[in-house]
Amino acid sequence: MLTDRRVILRNGVGVIARVLQRRELLLTRIAVDQPTLMVVRRGLKLLRAAGTETVIPAGGAAAIAGGEVFDVVNRPDSGIYAADFLVIDQAVIAGFAVPDAVRPIARALAIPAMAPDFLEAYERARAAVADPAAVPETVAVQRMREVLGWIAHHGGAFPPPVPPAIAQRIRVLVAGDLAAPWRAAEVASQLAMSEATLRRRLAAEGTSLTDLVTETRMAHALMLLQVTDQPVATVAALVGYDSPSRFAARFRQRFGHPPGAIRDQTESAAIRDQTEPVPAPAPNPAPTRLSA
């Protein structure tokens, strides 16, 4: 089993990462932008959306359609929650022949227990992402399709991709350079529209550029805290905050917990004691992205 504390991307194939968490936390409005298979190794995961709750126990998995938003609870077992995820590239999904009887996944497909062969296929797919030198791309893609076959066996298939909303396109832009100031003129130019059109389109989607930039930074901060061992101060710098204390204040404002709570570590205790005030959040903040 791969246990690297980092995010690994293989273009055209997929993304993998492993999450460790030591206390139970409720994280609200977490967006899963891409089709993802989440596997719980230890503890319990709860996904809540639209009045429903999906429970994934240890040894189980959830196949999540892209573009979904959940409230997430990761519940440790004896002090440890461990999970990992596999994001499958859209091109791989597009090339997979879905059996006629299989329906598109609506939000999330719960798989309470993974058969040994399914788990082996999943591990082989993760290994293909982690070690491109050892696994040719054609083989890596085939391993991904085997995982899709197992998901289909459980009655679901990832729906075909749809054109992304403006907000999602902006999140992708911001993620490419989290420290950039991202002014409206530059964003509008990159999206080939006027500033007025940009503001109007974002208003129609119930968000703003300021909210999206902040949310994207917080999303990546959450991911880095969950899947790497980098210090909180380093994470703050990576997502565009020169001041660790201001970062900690913004993080607490968004998630209701200080950064150190994600790992139940004390490294940010001094930061938490010196947090700077930040402006009040919008009433309905844009969703933060993937948290396994």
Where are these regions (language model features)?
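Cyclic nucleotide-binding regulatory module and flanking cytosolic helices
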Residues: 1-6
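N-terminal regulatory/effector-sensing and dimerization cores
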Residues: 7-105
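Short hydrophobic/aromatic patches on the structural cores and recognition surfaces of FHA
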Residues: 43, 59, 198, 221, ...
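Amphipathic alpha-helical segments enriched in hydrophobic/aromatic residues interleaved with Lys/Arg
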Residues: 100-154, 158
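A short, Lys/Arg-enriched amphipathic alpha-helix from helix-turn-helix/homeodomain DNA-binding modules
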Residues: 114-123, 140, 160-182, 189-191, ...
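Basic, amphipathic alpha-helical hairpins
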Residues: 125-135, 148-159, 171-183, 201-202, ...
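Basic/polar phosphate-binding segments, predominantly the helix-turn-helix DNA-binding elements
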Residues: 184-213, 230, 236-261
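Terminal helix-turn-helix DNA-binding modules in bacterial transcription factors
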Residues: 204-243, 263-292
